[in-house]
């Protein structure tokens, strides 16, 4: 029986998330609220903790206050057994400069690796929505003998040009790592599908440290994990692919097995929320066998008064619907929808208030937005464009704290 390997988790959470503006105007992308009760960072941390990995460093940088606070308050572990989940802001250990890329973030944090001295390091992104058992990927990595293993999700070749793509042979060795190619490669067993990189990696420690140090000396590098480190290891013959379809999460349904969403744009963020609200959701937040953990707020239950109605909705704690109609929507905590108001196909973040008789359709309202009596959002997009951000898909986004 193989002894348990010593694994350190590094979560790359410094993303600025420009394509999610205005949701990222005041916070880092991994801190953006999601699903009525979570932040994006909670999905990767839940996956790692559920797998038993309890020594995790979260590298932060861009507007990280709310993210650092959330990690410190929500993800506290007992230190008696050496367990920790700690936010690590840019330390400027190598001089007065910030991180210049994801690989540079690890370069500036090598002291964390030296202190922990792990056998293997999982390096995961912080801004995707999915369930995964990372321990299965680590076991695959150890058995394969690769220096780095890249998680790949199967996507149709016709859609793969939007991703970093993996070309591999039948043994799982990666032969090419291509950034958004015009002609994506097929998988060894299906020419109509392509392995897209999920941005999740497992490294043998020496391989990661050596490659990070070599990259730091390369003045032509962008110091990016996917753009520089992985291609260099592919060229050296040290990279393998892990098929995400092989990952078996306890409690997963046939419908949500293999679910993974990059929510880097407003339209993708909106669509991922709509995946949550059907009777048989595409992604099931209610899997008790592999829970997604978030901040536990001390709030009263949601209240429906004077005939308030919610259909195909998620409604957060402390929310009140008073003689209002809400359909196909996600409401976070402390949302109030007043008499006669209608909310359809929308995402309302904590503290939002919808006034009497107001109408909100296909919209994302950030925290503490107040919509006045009789106001209309999401019906006249030309008018909305003069006031708010409107995505290519017609989703209206109202920034944090705006009074309409």
From Swiss-Prot:
UniProt-listed SUPFAM superfamilies: Nucleotide-diphospho-sugar transferases, Trimeric LpxA-like enzymes
Binding site for alpha-D-glucose 1-phosphate: 99, 164, 179-180, 197
Keywords: ATP-binding, Carbohydrate metabolism, Glycogen biosynthesis, Glycogen metabolism, Nucleotide-binding, Nucleotidyltransferase, Transferase
BP GO annotations: glycogen biosynthetic process
This enzyme's EC code(s): 2.7.7.27
Record's keyword annotation contains DNA repair: no
Top-level taxon: Bacteria
Recorded metabolic or biological pathway in which this protein acts: Glycan biosynthesis; glycogen biosynthesis
Keyword rRNA-binding: no
Pfam families from the UniProt entry: Hexapep_GlmU (PF24894), NTP_transferase (PF00483)
Catalytic activity: alpha-D-glucose 1-phosphate + ATP + H(+) = ADP-alpha-D-glucose + diphosphate
Example of a GO MF term: glucose-1-phosphate adenylyltransferase activity
UniProt-listed InterPro entries: ADP-Glc_PPase, ADP_Glu_pyroP_CS, GlgC_bac, GlmU/GlgC-like_hexapep, NTP_transferase_dom, Nucleotide-diphossugar_trans, Trimer_LpxA-like_sf
PANTHER family per UniProt: GLUCOSE-1-PHOSPHATE ADENYLYLTRANSFERASE (PTHR43523:SF2), GLUCOSE-1-PHOSPHATE ADENYLYLTRANSFERASE-RELATED (PTHR43523)
Family classification: Belongs to the bacterial/plant glucose-1-phosphate adenylyltransferase family.
Functional summary from the UniProt entry: Involved in the biosynthesis of ADP-glucose, a building block required for the elongation reactions to produce glycogen. Catalyzes the reaction between ATP and alpha-D-glucose 1-phosphate (G1P) to produce pyrophosphate and ADP-Glc.
Subunit structure: Homotetramer.
This protein's name: Glucose-1-phosphate adenylyltransferase
Gene of this entry: glgC
